[in-house]
């Protein structure tokens, strides 16, 4: 039935054909729909009868009309009969095919007239009845709100006002350009709902259109996707909001705790000040009492001496008035002795008096304490420490790091972090990656020695100063361990070689005493060799060999399994740089490659990178690269030396030179 109904549907109104016209192209069209097409082609004040042609909406064939116009076209009576029978066979009810569009229009008008439409803009409760619905705004207004929102001036004069419509979505089903037409397609170009007339004869006829179902599915899918994202984002925001609220609560609790702590600490300071005030005040009172008591005693003594002296002075003055010589002589001697005794005794009775002890030297100076009180503030994280690279020391497996801090008194502890440095580009990434660092916590001093490091390796160090308020880290400092130190092994030396100078020098010595045979000793007549006393199986190592006049020697490395009766480099288990008078070669597995070092090569540097499989030789004094063996080392290797004349001296345990301590760029 649905397939049959689609065949009986008008391409313009999308309803069952009513009074169908049979077009010359064999398609059918409602009479009223054909008339609307002609009306849409008319210019202003132009009669419909003046239009003599139009296009079939189905096949776009041009239909030419006679003088009779649409009446000149035949009625499709057969099709009308089929439609009538189809309507009778269908189930009657709302929206059924048997229900004509006039009946549905009547029912819609009845429903519209019966249903009350309220103003959607009113602030009143309840809202007033709407008098108009603005199709442009898609809002129904009462008279008062309409006047307030749609004054008689542009752009509001262009708004389309219609009678109030109960449901706002109904107005979206009607075409804005053709008021009596329902929208049944979507203009993709203008992103707008349109009717069939808009596509046939309107401004959308050359636009890209799509079926409503297609656009519906696409927009619905897009809306669902956006809605999912919005819901997800909203959930994230709700989680964030909960965390923000929790953070606010923590701020409130912590602030209250800190305020209470501040009051408690200030009360303690005030209590200490009051205690010190009482103690110092007591000292002042005691000092005052002691001084006043001493001064009172001195005053009493002075008064007593003055009283005694006054009586004696009176008697002496009375005696001096005596004119009778005999009487004067009788009393003068006694008085003179008493005056002399009183003068002498006054010096004894009157103690030494310090008139400067007026308590003015008792000074109070709280300027330092005042400055400290003025600086009272909440605790902040300590300043970043500074690594003192010039004070740091290293061995082949340890590094001692020294640092300083501007505010040591506020630091509770230090934390030392370190990791292997693999290139300048990785410093930032390493600083941001906590997993890459070895950490030594709870250091109380300004230095620390790290043990168990790889020899000949550069490390990055950072020091973190910590207190209750937080922590701050120093700038990264780069320090490196020295190479593995070693000496020559006398037990491995050929019997015609002499090892001396603390086993650091080897020289040809025909007069050497007979040495006992050992498995590790070089024995061949031409292989005058000696090995180092270490076997290296990891890390980077650098040592130098001083050429002391020798013109025939070989310097290199060998596996423990290398034959002791062959020259180094003559087998697959050894690698060597050799000089035979004026011929310079590098040799491995009996293959020789000539090289051209400086004419007077005095010191050879050897850089072994075991993990990356390289053995490099350098002119150590001139920092010139000579040659590099690239080899995957499978066993521990031992430094090995051969000398046929004069002597060689080794210098080991050196740090790798800076110009070599990077990714090598070989010529």
Swiss-Prot record:
GO molecular function, one term: zinc ion binding
Biased composition (Basic and acidic residues): 499-520
Binding sites annotated in the UniProt record for Zn(2+) 2: 134, 137, 150, 159
Residues involved in Zn(2+) 3 binding: 175, 178, 198, 204
SUPFAM superfamilies in alphabetical order: B-box zinc-binding domain, Concanavalin A-like lectins/glucanases, Fibronectin type III, RING/U-box
Family: Belongs to the TRIM/RBCC family.
Protein name in the entry: E3 ubiquitin-protein ligase Midline-1
Lineage, uppermost ranks: Eukaryota, Metazoa, Chordata, Craniata, Vertebrata
